[in-house]
């Protein structure tokens, strides 16, 4: 019997001809990525205690994105430590305040199909969009990787999410994932590998594929993964990387999966997830008059260039409703520059958006845009757990950038298709 | 985790890492962060939990972020063991890395808050001393039990590195 893509990557990293689900194997790590929150400030004391250095500084990428820019003495100290530690350990791949790690990593050409990658953040499955096996670990696990260059893994089964058809106008990868969370639940991924397949996936741009793999975390999967194709190779080449042999990193036709779930992209409507779980998703039409204090477009999940384009398509020539504040935090400084060059930023700011720094920001309750008690926000981020974006009694609804922008204009939940050219 | 057992603190399904280690306090020292551990679902937990007490939970305990302060806060408060119907994968790894025993134990949700519970990690058995019920847990992979015996990944690596020298 053949192997899935995930199994092939793990077998290669474990130095084996083949692996089977359930086996526990030790893998050599091709790349380790960490950020300012779970990275240097947490691994430094561990490495010092062990009297050990970094196994291969070339294989480490550090991105400051959680506490950027510094807003108080504590965040300034964390960033200072991050800079000093990366310099002391010769980490050349340090991206300081240039965007969110999951977006910066592929943007700078670090990912290549077939790689076995660990990231010190739960949304690390994002890298699976590039045909990598990439998963999130905590800081002590990361310290172990930094010292030994290896980590253990229980070979996951593969769960296939097969998407037929094509997404309609005003519907995006975010809607696909909210609908998936609603159907499978927050532990439907059961720490296995979720692989996205089907015509709808093949037609998606890389940024949308990143959103799918990113939110595999919300299914409780160990990772999300998409087999590389020409779209993948073109993105990597444009980012200055090398895609390598994409034909090698495909699953075998006779590989066994735990299960296959079928979805229909043609009939998918824009989705909104009510507080306090991404799995509380329902089509936008299921909601009545839900009004908002804040609309937030940000994070690795919802503020890539395509996400900003979605918001701009709705906001063009319109104004944010009175009483609503629209905050936009582009996922990287490169995206900000591209959005400035193509006129997207002008569209957003003309509509009344306030631009925020590129970083994790309010998504993780850390940066600008956190909520007061009793406030309600609609957000393009990935999680709406109670208290995550600020006060315990605040409510966060999750939606696509299209739908967040539509809510900003309407002041309440609205179907974004009514705001797009030719709509209404 | 001896014969006297500890008090059971019982939680439901899908307890997330923002609840265990709220983002608002992530940049604060662990003693301050730990005071807010689980406060969104049980405001009395951090002040009331005693060393040796046991956290009992439903499905998908520790879902969400990879922040290991979610485990560290429990350890800081003296919790040595969490028994749950199931765990989120990253939390499960983090638990053993920091020497916290995480036992998957179907049916354990029947334990009542305040019951006396004894956990035997080596045997993989959870006993409700208040009711006499016992549960067999899913076996823990041998390399993770080794790690817990050593007190976590760092002391475990210390041993490995010392052996190499």
PLM features: residue spans?
Chain A
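Fe-S-dependent hydro-lyases/dehydratases of central metabolism
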Residues: 1-424
């Amino acid at each position: 019997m053949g192997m899935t893509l995930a199994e092939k990557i793990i077998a290669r990293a474990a130095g084996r001809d083949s692996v089977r689900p359930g086996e526990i194997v030790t893998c050599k790590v091709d790349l380790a990525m960490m950020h300012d929150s779970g990275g240097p400030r947490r691994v430094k004391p561990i490495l010092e205690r062990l009297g050990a250095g970094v196994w291969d500084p070339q294989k480490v990428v550090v991105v400051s994105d959680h506490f950027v820019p510094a807003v108080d003495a504590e965040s300034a100290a964390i960033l200072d430590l991050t800079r000093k530690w990366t310099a002391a350990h010769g980490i050349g791949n340090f991206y300081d305040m240039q965007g969110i790690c999951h977006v910066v990593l592929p943007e700078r050409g670090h990912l290549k199909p077939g790689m076995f990658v660990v990231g010190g953040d739960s949304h690390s499955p994002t890298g699976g969009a590039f045909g990598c096996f990439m998963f999130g670990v905590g800081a002590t696990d990361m310290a172990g990787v930094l010292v030994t260059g290896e980590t253990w893994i229980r070979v996951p089964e593969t769960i296939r999410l097969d998407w037929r058809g094509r997404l309609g106008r005003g519907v995006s990868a975010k809607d696909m994932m909210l609908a998936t969370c609603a159907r499978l639940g927050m532990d439907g991924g059961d720490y296995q590998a979720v692989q996205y397949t089907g015509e709808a996936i093949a037609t998606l741009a890389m940024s949308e594929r990143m959103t799918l793999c990113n939110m595999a975390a919300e299914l409780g999967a160990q990772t999300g993964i998409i087999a590389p194709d020409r779209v993948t190779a073109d993105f990597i080449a444009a980012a200055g990387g090398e895609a390598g042999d994409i034909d090698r990193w495909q699953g075998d036709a006779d590989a066994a999966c735990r299960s296959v779930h079928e979805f229909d992209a043609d009939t998918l409507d824009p989705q909104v997830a009510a507080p306090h779980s991404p799995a509380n998703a329902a089509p936008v039409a299921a909601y009545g008059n839900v009004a908002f204090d804040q609309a937030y477009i940000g994070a690795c999940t919802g503020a890539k260039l395509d996400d900003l384009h979605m918001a701009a398509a709705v906001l063009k020539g319109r104004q944010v409703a009175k009483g609503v504040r629209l905050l936009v935090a582009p996922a990287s400084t490169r995206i900000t520059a591209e959005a400035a060059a193509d006129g997207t930023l002008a569209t957003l700011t003309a509509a009344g958006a306030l631009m925020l720094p590129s970083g994790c920001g309010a998504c993780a309750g850390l940066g600008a845009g956190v909520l007061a008690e009793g406030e309600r926000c609609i957000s393009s981020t990935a999680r709406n757990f109670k208290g995550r974006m600020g006060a315990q009694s605040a409510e966060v609804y999750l939606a696509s950038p299209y739908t967040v922008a539509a809510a900003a204009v309407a002041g309440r939940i609205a179907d974004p298709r009514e705001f797009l050219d030719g709509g209404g | 985790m001896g014969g006297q057992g500890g008090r059971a603190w019982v939680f439901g399904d899908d307890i997330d890492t923002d609840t265990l280690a709220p983002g608002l306090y992530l940049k604060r020292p662990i003693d301050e962060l730990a005071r807010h551990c689980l406060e969104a679902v049980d405001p009395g937990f951090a002040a009331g939990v005693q060393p040796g007490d046991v956290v009992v939970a439903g499905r998908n305990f520790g879902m969400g972020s990879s922040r290991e302060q979610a485990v560290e806060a429990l350890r800081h408060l003296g919790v040595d063991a969490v028994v749950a119907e199931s765990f989120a994968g990253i939390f499960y790894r983090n638990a053993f890395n920091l020497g916290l025993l995480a036992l998957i134990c179907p049916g354990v949700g029947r334990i009542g808050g305040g019951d006396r519970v004894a956990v035997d990690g080596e045997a993989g058995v959870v006993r409700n001393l208040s009711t006499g019920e016992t549960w067999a847990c899913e076996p823990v992979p041998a390399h993770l039990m080794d790690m817990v015996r050593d007190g976590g990944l760092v002391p475990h690596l210390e041993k490995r590195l010392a052996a190499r020298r």
